[in-house]
């Protein structure tokens, strides 16, 4: 009788990866990148204070050559106070487009500091540009910021002004210092833990809602927000001063301020380079 043949089990499927199969189209997973801390970039500085305190004169003594956007027509009044300073007046600035075009033009290689005097006036140019170029969503005629509707005009101006800060950031990354000179205003400070109070702040757009506040955005943008004020004393409701002036680099009840490097107030003296030496080093010139 014939012997039955035993069937053998089939060999297990190979566990070797088949490289001939379809490949995944998924992009490679991104990895975090690390770099060195950038040295040699410029400082973003904002100064503000009452009229005549010396904002323009101080800016003119910054490390030169100083390129000056004299939107307030201040330099011609200062006259011989500017003797010996390396100031290069940027001309032909009559509109917001002129201001931005100049910042994007070639020829900045030798400049160490850019001054816009004032950012308050630059904001006026931004408003005029907004009214001219941003239409009403329903096609209505626009003559004032309020004509856009509740709060919308402030949003438009805010977005326009941000383009200037971006332009200036390019110069900061190239190693140039930027100084925005602002006029001042008195603003109410809400205090959740007690009574509100008033203080000096830069005169820039800042709606009560806090939204679209150019003032608060500029404070965030700046490395140094410096208040320049006269030294006064008040007794029995009467104020008196001695003519001395102080640069405040830190927030106090009477002024908005900040600095990434300065800790103490400085006396503001005529054509003194002390501020720039403390900010940029003794060889800042």
Per-region residue spans from a language model:
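N-terminal pre-Walker A segment at the start of P-loop NTPase domains
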Residues: 3-36
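Conserved P-loop
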Residues: 29, 35-128
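Amphipathic coiled-coil/heptad-repeat helices and related helical stalk/stem segments
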Residues: 30, 52, 99, 161-164, ...
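Hydrophobic/aromatic ligand-binding patch that stacks against planar heteroaromatic rings
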Residues: 57-59, 170, 217-218
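Short, well-ordered beta-strand core segments
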Residues: 66-67, 178, 225-227
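Structured loop/turn residues at beta-strand edges in well-structured enzyme cores
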Residues: 109, 174, 220
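P-loop NTPase motor core
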Residues: 119-214
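Conserved GTP-binding G-domain of TRAFAC-class P-loop NTPases and closely related GTPase folds
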Residues: 187-285
């Amino acid at each position: 009788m014939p012997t039955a043949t035993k069937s053998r089990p089939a060999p297990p499927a190979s566990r070797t990866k088949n490289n001939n199969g379809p490949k995944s189209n998924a992009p490679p997973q991104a990895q975090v990148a690390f770099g060195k801390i950038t040295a040699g970039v410029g400082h973003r500085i904002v100064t503000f204070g009452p009229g005549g305190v010396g904002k323009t004169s101080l800016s003119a003594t910054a490390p030169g050559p100083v390129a000056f956007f004299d939107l307030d027509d201040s330099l011609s009044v200062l006259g011989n106070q500017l003797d010996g300073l390396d100031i290069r007046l940027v001309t032909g600035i009559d509109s917001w487009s002129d201001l931005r075009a100049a910042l994007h033009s070639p020829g900045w290689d030798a400049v160490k500091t850019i001054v816009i005097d004032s950012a308050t006036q630059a904001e006026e140019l931004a408003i005029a540009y907004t009214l001219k170029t941003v239409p009403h969503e329903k096609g209505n005629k626009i003559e004032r910021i309020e004509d856009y509707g509740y709060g919308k005009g402030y949003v438009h101006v805010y977005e326009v002004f941000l383009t200037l800060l971006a332009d200036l950031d390019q110069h900061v990354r190239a190693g140039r210092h930027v100084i925005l000179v602002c006029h001042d205003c008195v603003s109410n400070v809400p205090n959740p833990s007690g009574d509100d109070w008033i203080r000096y702040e830069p005169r820039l757009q800042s709606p009560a809602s806090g939204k679209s506040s150019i003032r608060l955005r500029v404070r965030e943008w700046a490395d140094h927000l410096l208040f320049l004020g006269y030294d006064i004393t008040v007794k029995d409701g009467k104020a008196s001063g001695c003519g001395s002036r102080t640069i405040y680099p830190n927030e106090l009840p009477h002024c908005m301020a900040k600095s990434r490097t300065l800790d103490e107030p400085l006396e503001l003296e005529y054509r003194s380079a002390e501020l720039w030496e403390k900010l940029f080093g003794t060889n800042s010139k």
